[in-house]
Regions:
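Conserved, function-defining micro-sites of small-solute handling proteins
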Residues: 1-178
Length: 178
């Protein structure tokens, strides 16, 4: 989370986890926190650094360099524990907002009719790639930690995310048209 004093925030896209996290933060803080959707994180981070956007909610790999260079201040991370990439930045939970704990994740998806053997082979290849030397370091530059896992793990994660975010999306009144 990047923040100035104005009550607006950017996110990399409408309907993204950062969009909903910012909206939830505004609701929990009792402020009218206006969303400014961007097409990706880079333009929003540039606007925070340039002073034309008050704050940005985005994956931390998108702003670590600006934080370390002192061009912006990161006030919180949303993980369960402090990020190994930003150990000086407290979590929302540490600051009294445990409901803002979110572990953002990325997955690989294929069309619904992709044969099961192709999905299984892709899953094996991805898990093997994540174990290769240098992959963790490369992902770390982006602020990511490789996890890997089974197809069942991914299905459980998707359901858990749906169960978590569904009520929040309804609470803030977001629709695909909004």
């Amino acid at each position: 989370m990047l923040f100035r004093s104005d009550a607006n925030y950017g996110s990399p896209a409408a309907g993204s986890t950062p969009h909903f996290l910012g909206a939830l933060m505004g609701l929990n803080a009792g402020i009218d926190y206006k969303h400014v959707p961007y097409r990706g994180s880079v333009p929003g981070v540039a606007d925070v650094v340039g002073g034309t956007l008050a704050s940005m909610v985005t994956p931390h790999g998108d702003f670590i360099a600006n934080h370390k260079a002192g061009r912006l201040r990161v006030l919180a991370t949303s993980g369960k524990k402090r990020s190994p990439f930003l150990p000086d930045v407290p979590t929302f939970a540490e600051q009294g907002y445990p409901e803002l704990t979110v572990e953002e994740w990325f997955g690989f998806f294929a069309p619904a009719k992709t044969p099961a053997n192709v999905i299984a082979a892709a899953n094996t290849a991805i898990n093997n790639a994540l174990k290769q030397p240098g992959v963790a370091e490369g992902l770390g530059v982006l602020g990511l930690l490789p996890l890997g896992g089974s197809i069942d793990d991914m299905q459980k994660e998707i359901k858990a995310q749906y169960d978590h975010w569904g009520p929040i999306v309804k609470r803030i009144g977001f629709t695909a048209e909004s």
